[in-house]
Amino acid sequence: MRSEEALKRLHKSVVSCRKCPRLVIYLEEITNRKPKRYQQWDYWGKPLPSFGDPQARLLIVGLAPAAHGGARTGRMFTGDRSGEWLFSALHEAGFSNRPKSDRRDDDLTLSDCYITATIHCAPPKNKPLPQEIENCRPYLLEEFRLLKKVRIILALGQIAFTQTLRSLRLVGYEIPNLPFGHGRLYRVSRREGGKDFLRSDRRADLSTGAVKILATYHPSQQNTQTGRLTRPMFRQIFEKIREEIGEEQ
């Protein structure tokens, strides 16, 4: 219960954050200049909090909210094409009670899964600046501390993968330069007593100082429309997650 309360406080801090002037201005611009198809929407127009199950064993790290997706609806991956792919896959794998979500006040619930992002504000052209990523990093570090049951982290895209590794290093994980690749799975842990960072003799979760990292192409339109990421490829990622979680039970 304490971690749940702490996560709620963290969410409030995220929503009220104004550390990045460029992103604050951009959110105001997209809120005031809605495309015709969304004229009737009351845009969220603020940083987006993470959401999901506080007891989750799966942590998903995305890049950033979409300008007319999450920044409009008020929930990550809600109301955009990437979200359609993600929630469909989560539902099929048993992590979500719905295969689709269009607004934050629907009854979508995540089970054993928690969704966060590298940054919590929609950036212009979907490209956050390095300092903006650093400004948001403390939120991810705090989530690592609070989400103690996480056994596997799914990084959506290369930026999320790189920033996840950097954040884990900051909380004591000894991680070499691991290459990004769709479907690549790594197991890392904190260095203890000079032992190697790879450990096979303990359960992997954030509470024990060991975790698995799985990389995938981001389900962006750029990747899905070109065939770089297909439905079967994305489905296999979540089948792998189920296998890995099952092995740790």
Across the structure, where does each feature detected by a protein language model lie?
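Conserved flavin/dinucleotide-binding core of flavoenzymes
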Residues: 185
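A polyanion-binding, active-site-adjacent surface
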Residues: 2-182, 195-200, 210-246
